[in-house]
């Protein structure tokens, strides 16, 4: 199996500047590996640090120490503490992120919001929009809505647009932060199928999923985040 992600002794704390610079430890000694075609689910109660770990991998949070190595352009590259240019390049080419919430640009149609990652990757506008439409249709977004900005959609529709945008990319590593939260049974099943297809394509995935049944369906392994709890 090809190693795609290797997290070694990563740690994170936050400095509370409005409270006299108090340091609030979040996680420490975070260590796990993810191979190509594998979905690893982070488990643990709310507040245990699951989302913080995903954000450390994606580069939204800077690590205080340790290594986060991803297979980027054929080589294992440490993104912990990396220069912003390298992190942005890895996001563009290697790591995708599917969150619960969509930050849509006003007045941009849903079809273009979903197609944008493919356009960035160099696909033609026509082909990107065809693929975007197919994925929106699969996630039960009516075609009459595709030309409208997602800011006018319901919360559930916005979430499905966000899922489509995340899954449309051909990146080899995908981070999933509660992708099935608030979805009905039919759309949860679609997301499970999308994850299965990504596995088949060799994509490495790290997921946060609170639904026990969904976790059983998608997880090849689970990592208990409580073992990384940082003592205050």
What are the language-model segments listed below?
Residues 127-144:
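Conserved ABC ATPase "signature" region
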Residues 149-153, 157:
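Conserved ABC ATPase signature
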Residues 76-96:
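ABC ATPase NBD coupling module
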Residues 101, 108-119:
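Q-loop/switch helix immediately C-terminal to the Walker
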Residues 166-167:
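ABC ATPase C-loop
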Residues 163:
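Hydrophobic anchor residue at the start of the ABC signature
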Residues 58:
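Helix-to-loop junction immediately C-terminal to a conserved catalytic motif
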Residues 174-177:
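Catalytic Walker B motif of ABC-type/P-loop ATPase nucleotide-binding domains
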């Amino acid at each position: 199996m090809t190693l795609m992600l290797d997290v070694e002794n990563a740690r994170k704390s936050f400095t509370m500047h409005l409270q006299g610079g108090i340091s609030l430890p979040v996680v420490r000694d975070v260590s796990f590996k993810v191979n190509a075609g594998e979905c690893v689910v982070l488990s643990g109660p709310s507040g245990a640090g699951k989302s913080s770990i995903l954000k450390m991998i994606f580069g939204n949070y800077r690590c205080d120490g340790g290594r986060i190595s991803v297979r980027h352009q054929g080589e294992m590259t440490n993104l912990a503490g990396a220069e912003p240019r390298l992190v942005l390049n890895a996001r563009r080419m290697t790591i995708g992120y599917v969150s619960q919430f969509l930050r849509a640009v006003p007045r941009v149609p849903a079809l273009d919001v979903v197609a944008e990652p493919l356009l960035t990757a160099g696909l033609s506008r026509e082909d990107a929009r065809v693929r975007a439409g197919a994925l929106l249709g699969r996630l039960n977004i009516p075609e009459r809505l595709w030309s409208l900005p997602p800011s006018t959609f319901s919360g559930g529709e916005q979430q499905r647009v966000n899922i489509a945008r995340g899954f449309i990319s051909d990146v080899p590593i995908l981070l999933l932060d509660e992708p099935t939260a608030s979805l009905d049974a039919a759309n949860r099943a679609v997301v499970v199928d999308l994850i299965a297809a990504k596995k088949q394509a060799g994509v490495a995935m790290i997921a946060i999923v609170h639904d026990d049944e969904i976790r059983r369906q998608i997880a090849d392994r689970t990592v208990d985040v409580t073992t990384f709890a940082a003592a205050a």
